[in-house]
Amino acid sequence: MIKYILIEDERFAYEEVKRMMKKLRADYQMSGWAVSIEQAVELLKQENIDLMIVDIRLSDGLSFEIFEQYPVDIPIIFTTAYDEYALKAFKLNSMDYLLKPIDEKELDAALCKFERRNCPTPKTPAYRQLEETYL
């Protein structure tokens, strides 16, 4: 099961992403929600997660400060109403950069990209047969 956290200080945006995630990936488990840099750092220290969905502008600063305080090697889908932070986001572990309001198809595409890069593909019977024969 994929575990993720959502870092978002706007209640409406949080509810929308949560709704979309339940619809698009019902098998994913949200392990926590943070609304500030401080809460996000504490959440990262406590939770073992596979993915982060992170708003860039939080009420107490830019979310990049989270990773200065607590560096992580976790894939991140950034969300924001501003396109000026894209370059900085991609220098981190960014899987994607979604502009608000978030489009469900774009979130789905970002999740597919995450899955292609980070989730092991189940071996088909034909692949297992090849392994047994040649390895």
State each model region's role:
Residues 1-4:
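Extreme N-terminal starter segment of soluble prokaryotic enzymes
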Residues 8:
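Conserved acidic carboxylate
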Residues 11-15, 86:
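Charged phosphotransfer/docking patches of two-component systems
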Residues 15-22:
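Charged docking surfaces used in two-component/phosphorelay signaling
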Residues 22-30, 59-61:
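Short, charged helix-to-loop "capping" segments that act as catalytic/coupling loops
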Residues 27-35, 43:
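Short hydrophobic/Thr-rich beta-strand motif most characteristic of the beta2 strand and flanking loop
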Residues 37-43, 50-127, 131:
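CheY-like receiver
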